[in-house]
Amino acid sequence: QATEHNYTGCNCGIMDQFASVFGKAGCLMRLDCRSMEFEYFPFEPKGYRLVLVNTNVKHKLGDEYNQRRRSCEHVVEVLKPNYPGIETLRDVTWEMLEEAKALVPEVDYRRAKYVLGEKDRVLAVCDALEKGDYETVGAKMYETHWGMSKDYEVSCVELDFLAELAKECGVTGCRVMGGGFGGCTINLVKDELYDNFVETAKTKFTAEFGHAPLVYDVVIGDGSRKLD
């Protein structure tokens, strides 16, 4: 995190780095970025595959990420005089956000709205994982993708094309993976739909954009560790 802050100019969070070290095979992790406490939730979607689709569109994240962070911080600054106990958007309620709506630029409101919605979605997905409810997990993935596209504005036409295509193919869940502005979608695909989805994604994406996406079957593995 310090390297990204000090050398690339991207004021990123800690989530990616933390997951890369503390990841656990067959589990998703819920991380509290304030206390650094974390909890594992079993991810065992029998009858499904995790499929990564790479748009091969490169993204430059630095200032775009910083702009969104400033938007979120601005909402907190506006609310602090009336709510001195809040520190970050995690402390802001939906009612508080509606109070701020008339006091901040519309783009700041939308970006903060995405963050509050994502907080709710994380909790809903953790609950669904404990119940083995992968239909709900998938639905929340789509909600996240379109929130990132329409409210947070970190998607791109190629990623949105893949998300729409996934829905048409009956894919259970799809969302942008990573920082956005290109890169990949992660897809939760039923086994019986896998072949059709992969073939359709390759064919239609190539026809639309003139180059083929790369498709990978992926599994959740352990974090980085010393190899003997």
For the regions a language model picked out, list residue spans one by one.
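Glycine-rich, mobile lid/loop segments that gate access to catalytic sites or pores
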Residues: Q1-Q17
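C-terminal nucleotide
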Residues: F22-G173, L188-D228
